[in-house]
């Protein structure tokens, strides 16, 4: 395990140098790994494991997702099964269902979690708030997690490009004494770049905070606020969108992703430098109390309960589509459609 300096704090990380793919294969050579759920994370993780030479099967109920698995090369009766049969065959059950689906399918999965098996998650939600989800594993199995820091699509794309998506890992229960090595081996097998240690509760709280905050909720709120102010002051949709979204996503984000924010500040105009340095403080001071409120709401379980209640409603999909339709048809994101068409690579 390597020790790395993260902003002055030393953390332990695991890379492919310390734990090569060959070692992962050796550790898991006698295991049958079943990916349960072929939705968001399922395809990327299962296909990467398959391509890396592991004994992998998929468990999925009939429907569109099942047909997608067939299209991806999983063979019914050989490597593709119903959930019950896949869980029965598996020694490692990778539960990659959505949080809502885990709750409904858990009674189906649990009887097959016999002593010595391992139960794997890629999100700490179901275990962290198991007083709300009802997901309480048997005490005589390993319960482990590898959580890629990105979508299943990104995990697969980066794997095919010869790169890797960083992942966190955690061990909730070690009944066999081998949970750690299984966890790291699976993390390497799915195509992780490097692996850093966490706990189920830390992963769940940071993940929900990030999704509602800077990764999705807050970024939409910030972009829309700036776009609206520009439009209210006479700027055209094209100008407002370019100055708010397009320049950020197409020009600036790749720069600070590669080189850091200080590098980006150092390589922009003096007018931009001064303004950014002066205004980052007021934005920080305005936003931090909102993030603190968000984190508290996540940590106490309120956000988990909101998600559970919402996803459990029979008309959830219909209401979700209504909300997404409103977002999609808003002026800002309709402007985006035209702007994207005008990008040079699309002409």
Model-identified regions with their sequence ranges:
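N-terminal ligand-binding/catalytic initiation module
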Residues: 1-28, 51, 130-133, 138, ...
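Small-residue helix-packing motif on alpha-helices
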Residues: 66, 86, 102, 237-241
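Structural motif
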Residues: 32-34, 55-57, 78, 91-94, ...
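Rossmann-fold dinucleotide-binding core
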Residues: 120-212
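Rossmann-like NAD(P)-binding element
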Residues: 61, 70-128, 136-151
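NAD(P)+-binding Rossmann beta1-loop-alpha1 motif at the extreme N-terminus of oxidoreductases
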Residues: 2-77
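NAD(P)-dependent Rossmann-like dehydrogenase/reductase catalytic/cofactor-binding core
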Residues: 2-6, 11-17, 232-347
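Active-site-proximal catalytic alpha-helix in oxidoreductases
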Residues: 177-232, 238-256
């Amino acid at each position: 395990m390597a020790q790395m300096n993260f902003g002055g704090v030393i953390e332990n990380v695991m890379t492919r140098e310390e734990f090569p793919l060959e070692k992962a294969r050796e550790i898991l050579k006698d295991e049958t790994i079943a990916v349960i759920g072929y939705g968001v994370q399922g395809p990327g993780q299962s296909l990467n494991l398959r391509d890396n030479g592991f004994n992998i099967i998929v468990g999925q109920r009939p429907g569109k997702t099942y047909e997608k698995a067939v299209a991806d090369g999983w063979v019914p009766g050989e490597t593709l099964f119903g959930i019950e049969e896949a869980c029965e065959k598996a020694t490692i059950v990778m539960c990659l269902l959505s949080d809502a689906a885990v709750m409904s399918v858990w009674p189906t999965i649990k009887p097959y979690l016999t002593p010595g098996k391992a139960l794997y998650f890629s999100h700490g939600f179901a275990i962290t708030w198991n007083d709300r989800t009802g997901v309480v594993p048997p005490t005589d199995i390993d319960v482990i997690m590898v959580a890629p820091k990105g979508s299943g699509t990104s995990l697969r794309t980066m794997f095919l490009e010869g790169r890797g998506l960083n992942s966190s890992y955690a061990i909730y229960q070690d009944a066999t004494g081998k949970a750690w090595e299984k966890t790291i081996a699976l993390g390497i097998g799915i195509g992780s770049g490097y692996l850093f240690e966490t706990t189920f509760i830390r992963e769940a709280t940071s993940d929900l905070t990030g999704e509602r905050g800077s990764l999705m909720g807050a970024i939409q709120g910030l972009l829309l606020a700036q776009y609206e102010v520009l439009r209210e002051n006479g700027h055209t949709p094209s100008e407002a969108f370019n100055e708010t979204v397009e320049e950020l996503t197409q020009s600036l984000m790749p720069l600070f992703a590669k080189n850091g924010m200080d590098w980006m500040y150092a390589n922009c105009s003096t007018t931009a430098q001064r303004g950014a340095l002066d205004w980052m403080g007021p934005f920080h001071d305005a936003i931090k109390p909102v993030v603190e409120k968000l984190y508290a709401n996540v940590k106490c379980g309120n956000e988990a309960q909101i998600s559970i209640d919402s996803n459990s409603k029979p008309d959830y999909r219909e209401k979700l589509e209504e909300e997404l339709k409103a977002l999609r048809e808003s002026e800002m994101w309709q402007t985006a459609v035209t702007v994207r068409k005008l990008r040079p690579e699309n002409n």
